[in-house]
């Protein structure tokens, strides 16, 4: 029996009311007429995925500002500490888990590449290779599950979020980030927006559709934010620059450092992000959901 090559129902609500999105044919995007979820209708083959990710470079740059943001998140997570276990799904080489471990958390992670798994294992982390498998953990073992920029890469979101539910204790928290399909940049650039691309990104979320996904999987919303407007993304999407999105010299990173040193710029950033979140049009979708 051959594997299917296309989805015929919505990945979130299972409706068959799917419409191909004009202008996004190269990414095979369709939109659900029932819930509005946008996703890649084409199912990439194993070979397509291997060919893509074999050439997927690893970027080891870690901004000191990112470390600061990680610790601000961990400050928020303190009130959830009960089992003292935290899992980062798609943990890379463990930068977030480094900070969690320093604060006394028992840290766990999942990652696909042998290299990243070895690096994390050498740090003493509890790492499993491959996709999240709840069979690798005790039921309701974790206080916190995090996942930074991972959900857009998968085409089985109901299964993934259901797995979050099974390994989190009651009242435990999921914190997750993913690109926002309703961002100002996507509206401006449309299919030129380089966040959109097959077979790397297969699912595209908005505040509405990610809330639907988590609410239907046994979670309740604590917070949803959409923040940021990336000058780096704008320039690279338009072919005006080839700078790495995450790098010390990128326009975005230089701006982050200027903002950190200037109280007025910090106030301006906060005000802009408030407006972007209010209207749901920031680049990054950040969610906090508790297990019912």
Where do the language-model regions lie?
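Conserved N-terminal segment of class I S-adenosyl-L-methionine
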Residues: 1-148, 158-163, 226-227, 250-262, ...
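A SAM-dependent methyltransferase catalytic signature shared across enzymes that methylate proteins
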Residues: 11-18, 208-226, 265
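Short glycine/proline- and charge-enriched loop/turn segments
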Residues: 54-61, 189-198, 237-249
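Short catalytic micro-motifs in class I SAM-dependent methyltransferases
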Residues: 148-155, 177, 200
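Helix-to-beta-strand junctions that scaffold the AdoMet/dcAdoMet cofactor pocket
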Residues: 154-155, 168-170
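Short N-terminal helix/helix-N-cap motif within the alpha/beta-hydrolase-1
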Residues: 155-159, 186
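Short, glycine-/aromatic-enriched active-site segment of Class I SAM-dependent methyltransferases
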Residues: 174-203, 208-215, 229
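Conserved catalytic loop of SAM-dependent methyltransferase domains
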Residues: 222-256
